[in-house]
Amino acid sequence: MQSNFLTLRNPNIVYAVLFLLVLTLATSLAGQTRATYYVSTTGNDSNPGTIGAPWLTIQHAANTAKAGATVYVFEGVYNESVNFPSSGTESEPITFQSYSGQTAVIDGTGLPVNGTQGLINIVGKRSYITVRGFEIRHYTTSSENDVPTGVWITGSGTGIQILNNRVHDITTKTEANGNAFGISVYGTSKTPITQLRISGNEVYDLRTGESESVNVDGNVTYFKITNNLIHDNDNIGIDAIGYEGVGPVGYDEAMYGDISGNTIYNISGITNPGEGYEYDADGLYCDGCAYVTFEHNVILQADYGIETTSENQVCQSNGTEWSGPNNTGTAAKGRRPCYGRYATVRNNIFYNSNACGNSIGGYAHASKKGSHSNGGGSSYRDVFVNNTLYNNATQPGNDSEGGSTGEFQIQYQVGSAQGDIYENNVVYAGAYDTWIFSYVPFTKIYPAPPATLDWNLYNSAAGYAEGTSIWWGNVNRFKTFSNWQNRSGEDAHSVNTDPLFVDLGDTPPNFDTLPSSPVVGAGSVSLSCSVGWCDPDGSSPDSIYGSTDFLGNPRTKGSGVNMDIDIGAYENTGVAVANSLTVNLSARRHTLKPGQATTLTVTVSASPGGGGVPSGTVEFMLGSRLLKKRPLLPTSATESAATLPLSASQLAEGANTLTALYSGNSIAPCCPVSGPPVTVYGSATSAPITETLQ
């Protein structure tokens, strides 16, 4: 006994024993927190949540899951509104996702809506939660006071991810004064919602009244809204918002964001009483946002392609104009507007918009007193570079809203002090032949110019028309394009000529340019980051033009004094790129033994991608036998993908041939819908691959 006692007093041995105890405890806790659970429509919440004995409800799983947990939900319909009471951590997030190769449906049919409520609710101080691969659908209200939402995130937190979901049929039946959202994020605290990611989702068939399809509002920082497909909704597609009183004073701007790779179409307020039955819904909107990059997006058949401004003239109750990195502000009373500021809009395609392609400035005159949501805001240091615009302003407008305003619209409260820039853009006007439309007169309050324009290429099928093609500060009598250049001092290096698109008559239109195009090497690389916003954490921290063009090719050629850049969204490769669609089927492994499995992946890629992302479905075929049909979800503005697990038990011994059949996709004429859908990308089949069972 004496000997053993003395041995245990040896400090090295004591430390070793303690270490083993701590290690054992840590391993035990890790095993608990990194748990894997399962939910099934045939389960029971009294079960342990294993794959063999799953739970019945997603809510029970949410109540149970702690940091590090992963919850797999088997396919089926779950009629519930799910709240997440716990947070994950950066190293141990909480993940909820459909089981591999399946899609679980969260359906709101018949469920009540209380206040603002989602089918997915991440409310309060919540961090590191991922929701992936669900269909979220059918949630509605008849009450003006209630707001149904597909995904509702509010409060503060870090690292929330909403990935690869299909959100649809979220509606308010009282659109004149009501609201609904597809995905909505409200930062309501001095602590932001930050490192948010909304990616790979399809959001469609929404009736949102006075609200948006997807938004971030208030104190939301360092967010990414990327590679989503948003379509057939009756209000704004993606909106980054400030000054609405969602966040505290000085913390009320959605800022430091990346909105890229999205395809948005058929977005219009013309059938929405909440929008006054007008063509006023934006595909992309910076409404009081700050330091946001919009790039590599395709916007077609929206009312406005993109608008950067602020709807508010008095940003906060104490007159705070904006918060900055140090939360400083400037008074914003009266004629000094709030701004959508430091928005960089680059390498996008905007076409067939109903009212306007690109727009800056407040939609109404600022008043002497000023007020919230009066349209009296404006745009500050917003830079539009290397975009391609075609045939925008396709609708004549109506008595309440006036006529269409063409490709580039300049509204109110903008002048030389605001520093807005429009360069290196291809502007090809449609039937109304309006290239530039500026409401802004030359005044002392907002002295000319309302924006700096240069190095653009303008054209239209009808050619330049005096009194139509350019309206600038209530002056429209520019007899020729050169007369416009001389009298205004704008567009000194711009040209009026045919850009030589590869094929406007193809479906979709091919906006890449021929090798002989006048856009080649004709742009400018003279703008520095000091004139606008270059994301220091993005792909091009030192260039306002971006690192790649719309298709992902290098944005510039050469270096130093020999560097050049094309005009428009595409950098010419020296080869005329015809429209093409590629379906590719791959597998992680091509040889399986009994008991093994692999994952099949189909990608559908469009080039040069004028129709945006290929959507629809893909059929995984084993010989002539259908394994499963899966929905495609976007991975960029020109590519989508679907996956399916494949087990050895599904194969015959020896070589097995697999292919993937793409359905194709169509887009209806809009807006309103005025005919049958038009095929954008036709059906196609992948090359076969072989899986061998040994």
Model-based region annotation:
Residues 78-84, 108-119, 140-149, 171-181, ...:
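Short glycine/acidic-rich loop motifs that flank beta-strands on beta-rich extracellular proteins
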Residues 1-33:
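Sec-dependent, cleavable N-terminal signal peptides
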Residues 457, 482-571:
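C-terminal accessory segments
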Residues 74, 93, 97-103, 127-138, ...:
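Right-handed parallel beta-helix
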Residues 41-79, 83, 119, 484, ...:
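Acidic Gly/Asp/Thr-rich repetitive segments characteristic of extracellular carbohydrate-active
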Residues 29-60, 75-77, 100-102, 500-505, ...:
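Right-handed parallel beta-helix/beta-solenoid
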Residues 59, 63-67, 79-95, 104-132, ...:
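Extracellular beta-strand-rich solenoid/capping regions of secreted or surface-exposed proteins
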Residues 576-694:
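Solvent-exposed beta-strand/loop surfaces, strongest in extracytoplasmic domains of secreted
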